Amino acid sequence: MSDLWKTKEVSSQCQCFPLVIVQGFLGRAESRIWGDFERHLNHDCHGLVFDSVGPVSSLHDRACELYYSLVGGTVDYGEEHSAAHGHSRYGRTHAQGLYPQWSLENPIHLLGHSLGGPTIVKLQYLMKQGHFGPRAHPDWIRSINTISSPFRGSQAVYTLGERVDAAPEVRPFSMGAMLSKVIHTISYFSPILPKAFDFHTESRRMSFLDISIPSLLNRMWKSDWAESYDAAPYDVTFESADQREANQEGQPHPRTFYRSCATYLTEKVEGNENFHTITSSNLLSFPFSPPLYFLARVMGSFDFSKIQPVPSFLDEIKVPDDVEQGLLTGDHRKSLPEEYWANDGVVPLFSQWHPASCSSIHCQHAETMSPTPGIWYVEQWNNTSHMSLVPLWVASDCQKQYWLNLGRWLRAIELQN
C-alpha cells in the first residue's frame, strides 16, 4: 500500500452522495461495531447508511433485500428464482426505505466487506437485467467499493465443510455442518430473539411460527438451506463463481466507478513448493484469532486439483491437457501464480481483485487520483488480515489510512459530475 493519496488533496467543492455499507457472511453493518471511522472518511460530507441483509443468504437474495431496504416496499426475490429454489417469492416489508429518493438524480456509493462485495455486484447485475422493473437503473450506483471480497470464490468454504467433489453438499460433522444446525436453531426462535440474531429467513419459513419441532429436526439432519444452490456457502465456491462469470456478472458498467482493496498476510515458505503461511511477525502484529491462523495455513497449501468441476482459472495456466489433473501437485504446482495461495485468512488474493480474470475485464492494478468509470481499480494491502480494516474499529493506522483514502477517492469521483 503506497502513500499516493497523501501527495495531493482533493477539492471539497463537490456534491456528496451517501455511502451505503453492506456487511459479509454472518456480519452486521452498524455504527456501534464499525466505530468512529467517519471523521477519517469525509469530515461530515457523506451521509452513511448501514444496511442489513441476510447474513447467510445467497447473493441473489441478499441483493434483493438490499434493494428493497433502500427504496422501501416488500422484498421480491422474483417468481422464477423463488420457484427454482423452493422458497417464498416475497420477504419482509420495509414501510420506509433507508434511502427512498434513490434515483438517477440521487445515486449512491456502495461499500461491501467480504461477501458484501459480490452482493453489491449482484445488485447492479440484477438492475441491468431489469429484475426490479424498468425504473431501476445501474446508473443509480455511482461507485462500488470492496474490501477483502471473494469475487471468484475461496478455498476456505471447502476447508469448512463444502464437498470439493459435490458442492453444495456438506461433509457430516464438519464446521459447516455444525454451523448450519446453529443457524436453523436460531432462526427457529428468531421471533423472540434480539435483532442481532436476525437472519432474514422469512421466505424460507424457518421459525416456530411456520414449522414444527419435528420439521426443525429434519432440517437439522439435512439442511435444505445449507445444502442448496441458493445459500451463501455455495456462492463462495469456485463453481458458483464460474457460473457468475459465464453470465458476465461483474463486468464494469461504463458510468460506475470501481475500487477493490485486496488484503493478504501470508508469505511464501522456503523451498520449491508454492506454499504460503503466516509469518511470526504477522502473528504478533494483529489481534489474530486461531481460526484465521488455521484457515490461512490450510488455504496456503490447498490442492486445487481436487475440486470438481475443475475451476475455470486453471484454464488460464498454459499447460498441456494431459497434465491438467496433476497441475497442482508435484512439479506442476509451481505453474500456478502465488496469488492463488496468498490470502488474508479467509479469501485468496486473486479472488479479491475483481470478478473474472484480468484478461476478460478492464482493470488497473494501481492507485490513481484521477479515476475513470468502467475500470476496476485494484490496490493490495500486505500484512493485512480479513478483519484488519473492518468491521471492528480499533483505530489502527491502517484503518485510518483506508478511510482517508476512500474519502479522497469518493470526492475525486464526485468532482467529475
Residue ranges and their predicted role:
Residues 1-111, 115-417:
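Lipid deacylating catalytic domains
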